[in-house]
UniProtKB/Swiss-Prot annotation:
Sites where the protein binds pyridoxal 5'-phosphate: Y72, S108, K109, Y132, N187, Y218, S246, F247, S248, R257, N292
Keyword field: Aminotransferase, Pyridoxal phosphate, Transferase
UniProt KW Plastid keyword: no
Protein name: LL-diaminopimelate aminotransferase
UniProt KW Transferase keyword: yes
Source organism of the structure: Leptospira interrogans serogroup Icterohaemorrhagiae serovar Lai (strain 56601)
Swiss-Prot/TrEMBL GO biological process terms: lysine biosynthetic process via diaminopimelate, diaminopimelate-aminotransferase pathway
PTM sites of type N6-(pyridoxal phosphate)lysine: K249
Cofactor annotation: pyridoxal 5'-phosphate
Subunit structure: Homodimer.
Binding sites annotated in the UniProt record for substrate: Y15, G42, K109, Y132, N187, N292, R388
Pathway: Amino-acid biosynthesis; L-lysine biosynthesis via DAP pathway; LL-2,6-diaminopimelate from (S)-tetrahydrodipicolinate (aminotransferase route): step 1/1
Amino acid sequence: MANINENYLKLKAGYLFPEISKRVKIYSEKNPSAKIIRLGIGDVTLPIVPSVVDAMVEASKEMGTVGGFHGYGPEQGYSFLLKSIADHDYGSLGIKIDESEIFVSDGSKCDCGNIQEIFSTDSKIAVADPVYPVYVDTNVMAGRTGEIGPDGRYSNLIYMPATKENGFQPEIPKEKADIVYLCYPNNPTGTVTTKESLKAWVEYAKKNNSIILYDSAYEAFISEPGVPRSIYEVEGAKEVAIEFRSFSKTAGFTGLRCAYIVIPKELKGKTRSGEEVSLNSLWNRRHTTKFNGVSYVTQKGAEACYSPQGKKEIQTSIAYYMANASKIRDGLKKAGYEVFGGVNAPYIWLKTSDNLSSWDFFDKLLNKAQVVGTPGSGFGPAGEGYFRLSAFGKKEDVEEAIARITSL
């Protein structure tokens, strides 16, 4: 028999969302007539907008012609999409991003998990707590985290608590981290950061030769003025930061799969001997070796997101979800819950009632209200006693779910 990668055995038992599915399945089998409302995993419910559908239909028709057929495309992405991303997502902010600095992929989850492959396995990793589990689990798999302790923390990770007391803004660590994961608007807390805070992170990264991995998958949900949409709004960030963006929640592409990662040419890593290496070139080598590119049809759909009509339709979808978020926030607040997020992000982070643990609160909502959310402890030890609800449900389901919860 071949030896296995034993780092996989260090993973916490059961990834968060499969564990939720398991509990819901058990309940459903015992209560087959129960109407369960799911406000847990962040999958969208609205259909793809017409502009995107039309573009994909036309692209599909092209594929059925001799002159319009596309086989393997450029792994980095078609130029028409790269240009749209550079012009609309960054040019509109006054940020110059070259097409060669953008890599189109099949999802931010994949990018966040794969990017660690280009860094040394002895790199010191810093994550917020609570945190999107993929950041931690992929580094566990790579062998960077050490063993898990009785408190649920891995011995070789730097945890940066994001709590009510610090406004869910993780404090900059006193020790040196090689890789720092940041996510804004934040999953799971639904909170945002400030430009001043990002400046401090960029300064820290420069001082410590660190790389910031900036997950901005929910940028399109920002509604308040002054909230930074990209870390590259901060001067010097191109020298220290990689940014992740996605069409999944912005345009409902969870079933189509399209995202992108930005790695500026200025960004460097180093070898053990101290030689500088372009991270853009390194990722390009990895990307073209392990990935054949997103389909032509999907990329034409993504391009349509940037058309005037596409933007208008997508904003209507985003407004629908954020109206759900407001309903959740307002309903829970009226019922006496302590609530965070849900203003610039589609997630609401709430304190559990009666000092229940996160999983006990999950079971309470499932068994008494038939509502499914996400236990905060699944995002890290600092998430214990909290709970995440998603605004991606249907309007009528959200309204019924809040009515059920507030009647408990």
